[in-house]
Amino acid sequence: GVPFHSRGAITDEYLAALKVLWTHDIASYHGKFVAFENIYTGPRPQRIPPIWVGGYSDAALRRTVNLADAWHPIRINLSDFQTNGVPRLKQVALKFNKPMPNICPRIKLKVTQEPINSEDRLAGHGSLSQIRDDLLTLEELGCQYVLFDTYNEDYSVPDHPTQGLAWLVTLADKVLDLAGETIRG
């Protein structure tokens, strides 16, 4: 029931209000969509939860730079991510004189036996070698975390949760150095 054109402004206010609640014992906030006065919030979190914002729109990048700790894009094509996504985020950070937020993408994992040779290939789709290269590129771009999304929207695939778990085990065995929190050489 939220008007489409108001979603961004509402999200901005909710994020700002959360930060007030997390950083004050007695919190007040007065906005267009959220308002509260003298709310006792204790005990406050010992560590303020990090806020990750997704999306590729200009508004999402502004929201990330101004209100979040990390940018969380999903379903990324590495070529576009390198030449468009990350540079745009840097430009927005410079425009607002803010530090560059962490970059923590979610990649849809789909391990194949053979390489996928397509300009439209998503990061995380392809052979183990391609996925290793994707992760190395993300590391070079300064990504702090990478989430592997194994959720398969294709319900015609039997045992799709089992397949996702198998992909994660394979990555852990052959691509990732879990103890070192890095990628195997």
How should these model regions be labeled?
Residues 1-185:
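Active-site-adjacent structural elements that line small-molecule/cofactor binding pockets in enzymes
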